[in-house]
């Protein structure tokens, strides 16, 4: 092997070590965030089940007439619960639980953003600094957190609307409805092991820390470009059999300008929730 190839291999190894160190820090954020979101989903589900008592007029008594003490739990839907009334209850639940989601997400995203920026500076061997005082980082955190929690709650609401509709149509008792709600929120937290499905809590944690890490890297590169350094990027997959065709197509492009969209239309990973790809950057080589 020539000296030039040895040097290139050594440089690539150092870059990988630098990048890997910060990425490992980011990955260590995933588990604590997942646990916090699991707890948030459980508390949200329990609170919603309790607040359904506000619409008890939509339940008709049913079940064993000799068990009067259990009458409330055995009341069944007598007419459809109007969407506006359900939405009003859900709005109360969101308001009372928003901090359970927002704080752990905000904390993890901020750290992942910083790790991404610091890791990229190390990979590029730039003797510069990066922190959350960076204007682009501040803008990202300001816009991202509120939108994310809103998106999580909107998805939850849509899932619950389907459940409530089924309860209406099949005349479920309050007890059965409440149990189904709590069970659904439990699935949000821990998934369905029998189906080998990751939980929503895990997927959100992986996706949002990954997105923030990639954004931190991109912010550093955009700042360098603004300073007159000509940069380029390349999509990188993990290279196993689970990689989607869209990500393979992005990787096949090779090195492109940092403001050029990839074949999928994305500026950077993640292309979808749970995407395992990352963006590589370098100073553009002279022609």
Predicted regions and their residues:
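N-terminal leader/targeting and assembly helices and adjacent pre-domain segments
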Residues: 1-191, 284-287
């Amino acid at each position: 092997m020539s000296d030039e190839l040895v040097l290139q291999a050594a440089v690539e190894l150092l870059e990988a070590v630098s990048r890997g160190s910060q990425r490992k820090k980011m990955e260590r954020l995933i588990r604590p965030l997942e646990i916090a979101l699991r707890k948030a989903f459980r508390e949200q589900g329990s609170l919603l089940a309790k607040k359904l008592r506000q619409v008890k007029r939509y339940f008709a008594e049913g079940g064993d007439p000799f068990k009067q003490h259990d009458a409330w739990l055995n009341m069944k839907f007598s007419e459809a619960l109007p969407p506006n009334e359900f939405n009003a209850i859900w709005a109360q639940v969101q308001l009372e639980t928003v901090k359970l989601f927002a704080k752990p997400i905000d904390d993890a995203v901020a750290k992942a953003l910083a790790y991404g920026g610091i890791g990229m500076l190390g990979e590029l061997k730039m003797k510069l600094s990066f922190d959350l005082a960076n204007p682009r980082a501040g803008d990202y955190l300001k816009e991202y957190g509120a939108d994310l929690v809103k998106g999580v709650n909107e998805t939850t609401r849509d899932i619950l609307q389907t459940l409530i509709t089924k309860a209406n149509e099949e005349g479920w008792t309050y007890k059965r409805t409440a149990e189904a709600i709590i069970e659904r929120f439990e699935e949000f937290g821990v998934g369905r092991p029998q189906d080998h499905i990751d939980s929503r809590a895990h997927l959100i944690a992986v996706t949002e820390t990954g997105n923030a890490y990639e954004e931190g890297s991109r912010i550093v590169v955009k700042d360098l470009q603004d300073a007159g350094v000509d940069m380029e990027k390349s999509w990188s997959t993990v290279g196993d059999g689970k990689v989607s065709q869209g990500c393979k197509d992005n990787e096949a492009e090779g090195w492109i300008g940092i403001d050029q969209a990839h074949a999928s239309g994305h500026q950077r990973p993640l292309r979808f929730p749970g995407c395992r790809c990352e963006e590589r950057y370098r100073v553009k080589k002279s022609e």
